[in-house]
Amino acid sequence: IVRVMHEAPPQDIRSVLDELEHEYRKRSRGFVLEKVAGGYQFRTLQTIQPWISEMKQSRPPSRLSRASLETLSIIAYNQPIARSQIEQIRGVESAGTLKHLIDRELITVVGRKDVPGRPLLYGTSRRFLEVFGLNDLASLPPLPDVEPIAENSE
């Protein structure tokens, strides 16, 4: 919207979008305007989600494997992060999983680590925020405290 309305100040555009967001929530519609990934998206209401899910069943599901979700969460909470660090945390080789996440546009190469060999550093993408309905990385749920778990296992 900012690109199309290049003469309007961004704060004016945000103000109008906030007004629209409020209006759509106030009226009973099948969708709302939400802040997602630093921008705005129209999204369906949770109350009509069962019907949307039923309509989507005609397509084969596109789920992430446990390995992909594990790797994605490691990257999300530790970015920027090198493959060797991911593999150290997971305890298994992760090149294939990283390629899969890059192909799905959920992660991206964000730079190189300043050590010998200059390994690639990975981070989450804007698509990651959109898919998981997050406005920014600060919206990630907090990690559970694992200290008590470790103490109980001794």
How would you name each of these model-derived features?
Residues 61-80, 85:
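Short amphipathic alpha-helical interface segments
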Residues 1-3, 82-89, 101:
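A short acidic, leucine-rich amphipathic alpha-helix
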Residues 8-19, 89-106, 116-119:
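Short amphipathic alpha-helical interaction segments
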Residues 43-69, 103:
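Short alpha-helical segments that sit at the start of domains
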Residues 35-52, 112-134:
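Short, cationic-aromatic polyanion-contact patches
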Residues 130-154:
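Phosphate-centric recognition/catalysis
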Residues 21-34, 105-114:
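A short, conserved structural fragment
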